[in-house]
Amino acid sequence: MKSNFKWIVLMVITPFFSNGQLPYLFRDTSIAVFHGSNRLQNPWASGMNTTNFAEIDLNGDNKMDLLEFDAPSFRVNPFINLGQANVSSYVYAPEYRSKFPTDMEGWVRTFDYDFDGDMDLFSYNGGGISMYRNDFSTGTGLLFTLITSSIQTHYGGFQTNIYVSRVNAPALSDLDNDGDMDILAFSISGSWVEHHESFAMDSTGNPSSMKFHYIPVCWGYFVLAGNRNSAILPPVLPTCPLVAANPYRAYFDQERGIVDEEVGQLNNSNKSMRHAGSSLVVYDNDGDGDKDVLNGDILGSNLLFLENCGTPDSAWICAQDTTFPSYDTPAYMLDVAAPHYFDVNNDGNKDLIVGNFFPAGEDYNNVIFYKNTTNNQSNIFNRQTDRWLVDGMIEVGTGAHPVFFDVDQDGKLDLLIGNDFYFDTSNAIAKVAYYRNTSLGSKAEYTLITNDYSTLSSYLLTGIYLTFGDVDGDGDSDMIIGHSDGSLIYFQNLAGAGNPCIFVLSQVNYQSIDVGDNAVPQLFDVNRDGKLDLLIGERTGVLNYYENMGSTVSPIFSFVSNNFGGVNVAKVGSVAGFSTPILFEKQGNYELLVGSFSGYIYHFSNIDGNLSGTFTLLDSMFQNIFEPRLATPAMADIDGDTAFDLVVGSLSGGVVLYTQDQTLSINSEQDESIFFNLYPNPVQMSLNLSFEKESTTRKLIEIVDVTGRLVYKLQSNRQQITLDVSKWTPGTYLCRVSDSKRTFTQKFIKY
C-alpha cells in the first residue's frame, strides 16, 4: 500500500471537524510509554534542561510536592509526591501550572516566611526579589498573592531593594534561629555574600512583617576566587565591606585594596573577582546549629561546600570541599551546578539534588540524586542516579521535534522525535528517537526502539526536523530532513511499498534549497495538482513555499515565496520565530497550524485559491496551548478514537500530549459553563470539581472506573463540589459531566 505522509494527514484530520467547529483538546498524561519493559512514570512531562527545584504542597495533603522551574522557557512543571515511604515517586500534575504566577524569571525559591505552614514563593524581578504569599485553602486550593515585587532592606540610613541578579540565586533561611527568614545573596560584584538579616520578630513579633537590614560584612568572611569555584578563606582575604566588628579587619581596605603582603598579589583592584552566575543553598550539614553552604558557580563545573565553624549569629567559613561530595562521586555540571536540599524519597532525611542552573549545560544526564544515607544532623550523600525524574520522561536532550509516521508499515502511526542536539562535555550532535506504536486494540501505547533512528548521528547534524512523502514515485515514503543551517537532506527509501522503511542518504543540500537557518519542512500538495510541494518553516518565523514544477517521479522544487500567506509567528521586536508548519484539510478546505518559539500555536484559514495572498489568522493561541519555548506540534489520531490529537515538542527536550474529547466541540457561541477542573490529580483523599462559570442549569456528574462501572452519580448546579474518595480503589477514573446538549470528560488517578 502506498504510504505517503500527506495522505496520512488528510486521512487523520478530515473527519474531525464536523459542523465547522473546532475540537476541544485537553492535556493528557495517561497514554503509556515504555523503555524496554519499564513504563515511564511521566512520559508527557515536557522534559527538563535547566532545572530549578523547590518544595511546595500543591494539593493540601501535608506532603511536600515538587515544583520545577525552567527559567529560559518561563515554564513551571508541578509534580505530586505520592508519599510512599523510602520511595522517590512523583507524578506530573500539569493542572497546577495555571496556579503559579506567570511573571516569574531567573530562579525560584520557596520558604515559609510567615511560618503558617505553607511554603511561599520567591523569584527574580528586575534586580530584586518578588514574593508571593501562599494563601492555600480548601475552597481555593493553591493560591498565590503578590506581597511585594521588590523586597526592601535597610542599608544604614536609607532603604532600597535587596539586589539579586537574574543569574545569582539567593539562599533563604532562618540563619540565626530567631523565627524569621533571613536572606543571603551575592553582592553586585558576585564575589562575596551579603547578609540581609530579618528583624521582624525583634521589632513586631510577627515574621511576616518583612523587615530586613543589611549586615555590612562578608557573611562567613569568605569570598569566591576570581577564576574558579572555590573560596578564599580567612586570614587570606581580598577586598570586602568593612565594619569595626569584623575580626579580619586587618586584611580589608576598601580604598586601597589588599594591604597585607601575603595576599597583595591576589587582588589589588578587585576586578578579577567579578562574575555572575551562582546558585546558593545553605543548610546545617553537621548538626552544630549554624548553616553551611553549597554553591554552584559559573567559575567552575564543580559543587563547592563551605563549612561554617562559627555560630548562628556569627558565621565563619573555615574549610571547603571543592569537589563535593569528595567522599563519594563528586557532582559535576558542565555549566553551573544547581544544588537543592530536600527529602526526595520520603524517609525523613533530606537528600541532595544537583541540576543545571544555566541552559548551556548537559541536557540528558542532568539531574543528579544523592541519597542521604544518615540523617539531617550528619548528612552523608550517596550518588544514586544522574537522571533523577527525567528518566521517567520522553527526553531527547535539547529541542524535541516530533512527527508521526508508520516506520514499520504495520498500519499504525509511530512517533519519531528529532532534536536540536544532545550536549555533553564536548559534543552537540542531533539524533532521532523512534517510539514504535505498540498499541493493542484501542489501548494506545508507545515503546522506545532506539534513540538514534537510522544512525543519523553519524552525519553530525544539528537541528533535525523530519518530513515524509513519496518523492520518487516508487510507492513508499522517502524522508527529507530539515537542518539547522537552513538546508535539506534527502534520504531515499529502498524498502518498497508496504515494507519497513530502509532509508539511504541520497543528496545533501537537497536541490540547493536554503532558507537561512533552522529549516522545518513539510511535504504536502499545496496547490492541489497531485504533486508533493515543500512548505518550509525557519528561524525568522515566516514560511517558504517551493512548488513542485517537476513530476511525482522526478520533482523539481522551485522557489515561489519566502512570505507564504503573510505568516510570521515571531513576536513583535523578535527575530526568533521558529515556524513549524502543519498544513491539513478540513471539510475540503486547507487550514494551517504553525508552531512558534513563543510556545503558542497559530491557526490560519483562507488558503485555497489564495496561495499568493494573505491567509486569515483565526487564532494566535490555538486551543490555549502554551508550551514554551519552541512549540513544535505534530498531529495524528494516536488513541484510535477517530479524532485528531497533538503532540507538542519544546526546547527542553520533551513532549506533551493533547487529546480530543469527541463529545465536546468549541466555538465562539458556546456556553462554557460545563467546563470544569479536577484537582488534585492524582488524588488520595478529597477530589475537588470546580466549574469555570456559574450556571443555574443542573448538570449530571458521573464517575466511572476503567471497566465502565458507575461509582458516583450526582445532579447539581453548584460551582464547587468536593468528593471524599479516600476509600475508593486506587486506579484510573473518568469524570463525566453532561447537560442537555453536551458531555465533557476528564481522567483522574486515585492512589
PLM region spans:
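Sec-dependent signal peptide recognition
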Residues: 3-10
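Hydrophobic h-region of N-terminal signal peptides that target proteins for export
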Residues: 11-19
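C-terminal outer-membrane/trafficking sorting elements
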Residues: 12, 669-751
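Hydrophobic residues in alpha-helical membrane-spanning segments
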Residues: 16, 298, 582, 681-683
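Beta-propeller-forming repeat regions
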Residues: 21-666
